[in-house]
Amino acid sequence: MKNWRTLIFGLMFSVSTAFAAPQQMDKIAAVVNNGVVLESDINNRLQSVKRDAQHAGQQIPDEQTLRHQILERLIIDNILLQMAKQMGITIPDQALDSTIANIAAQNHITVDQMKHRIAADGMNFDTYRDQIRKEMLIAEVRNNEVRRRVTILPQEIDALVKQISNQNTNDTELNISHILIPLPENPDQAQMEKAMTVVQKIMSELKHGVDFGKLAIAYSADPQALKGGNMGWSRLQELPTLFAEQLQLAQKGAVVGPIRSGVGFHILKVNDIRGGNPTIAVTEVHARHILLRTSPVMTDDQARTKLQQIASDIRSGKTDFADAAKEFSDDPGSALRGGDLGWTAPDIYDPAFRDALMRLNKGEISQPVHSSFGWHLIQLLDTRKVDKTDVAQKDRAYRMLFNRKFTEEAQSWMQEQRASAYVKILDGNDAQQ
């Protein structure tokens, strides 16, 4: 699970998210604050989940159970979309198109091929775009709100770095599926007994070989329930502390739990385990430059010609690079140091500057280079390999802690939003608030 890189901040889409079937008659299934969930919304999502499950070979529960899970998910989505509207959050078309292009690329197809596949599945591409936009809005609201609740102290980072070093498990990743049986903040005895009955039923069915994903779809209150509860790949340290403690010695295929937390009971399954060997040595460059900015009195041609003359004077010995930088450079930060930029990773520079720099040999001076800042004369002084183990470990520890705390806080936050909203479920003679 790469929530940090991709959307601590992370979206989980499939090509078949929205199903557009014509509806002869529509009814209100639930009232959510000042909005509604329609029967057509449930039916559309029901068809989508069934189709996705069929493509993935995933078993699903009976339709009534599946319908209940979908309704709960749509209620949460409705609440968060209302929050997005209140906050004035929008998704620009450019960002939406980029996300759809990424989804297509992840499925190894073009956007045009995606459109054909969506049409072949009986879906409307405009409806699909609208659903993706909603998913992005929901993710934006959740990320913005939950991020504020996550605090990471320096001593936490140091402690995790030490733990990683001692255990040498920093590169081991687990693919986990998760079932959450929720509980209110201060459950009474009846609520506890009801939840435990469900937990015991699930554990019994797992022992008798019932598919974990099917049970997650049927019972779990986790956001990934309709995807069979799969949380993706995570390092042990990225998982909630309660999970990590129970999973340290778990093997592939193991079922762990139930685990009691502040939001309910958790059951986990280890789908797979993998390791890796990331490189944490980086190349740094020591460079200096002379910058000329264009202006009403300095055109591009004049700047380029001026730098060519300066370079000629340096090569002939008429002046040296440092003196020329002090006299001519428009970069006040480095000019006083003779244009010296110090040691740094080349990726921090403007792409045009970086590319020209990395083509130079040690001591070589470039031709005039144009970047977003102006025109440069660049000299590569030296390169070196630097061991960034400590920096990389602290960065990794921060991301692990953030992902872990974000996951914990997101579940609590969504339950709080559900509990504080006005929700009335309309189902025949039955109404629930």
Curated annotation (Swiss-Prot):
The keyword Cell inner membrane does not apply. One of its GO terms (cellular component) is outer membrane-bounded periplasmic space. One of its GO terms (molecular function) is peptide binding. It comes from the Bacteria. It catalyses: [protein]-peptidylproline (omega=180) = [protein]-peptidylproline (omega=0). It is an enzyme of class 5 (isomerase). Keywords: Chaperone, Isomerase, Periplasm, Repeat, Rotamase, Signal. Residues 1-20 form the signal peptide. InterPro entries: OMP_Chaperone_SurA (IPR050280), PPIase_dom_sf (IPR046357), PPIase_PpiC (IPR000297), PPIase_PpiC_CS (IPR023058), PPIase_SurA (IPR023034), SurA_N (IPR015391), Trigger_fact/SurA_dom_sf (IPR027304). One of its GO terms (biological process) is protein stabilization. It is found in: Periplasm. Its EC number is 5.2.1.8. The PPIase activity resides only in the second parvulin domain. The N-terminal region and the C-terminal tail are necessary and sufficient for the chaperone activity of SurA. The PPIase activity is dispensable for SurA to function as a chaperone. The N-terminal region and the C-terminal tail are also required for porin recognition. Chaperone involved in the correct folding and assembly of outer membrane proteins. Recognizes specific patterns of aromatic residues and the orientation of their side chains, which are found more frequently in integral outer membrane proteins. May act in both early periplasmic and late outer membrane-associated steps of protein maturation. HAMAP family: Chaperone_SurA. This is Chaperone SurA. It comes from Photorhabdus laumondii subsp. laumondii (strain DSM 15139 / CIP 105565 / TT01).
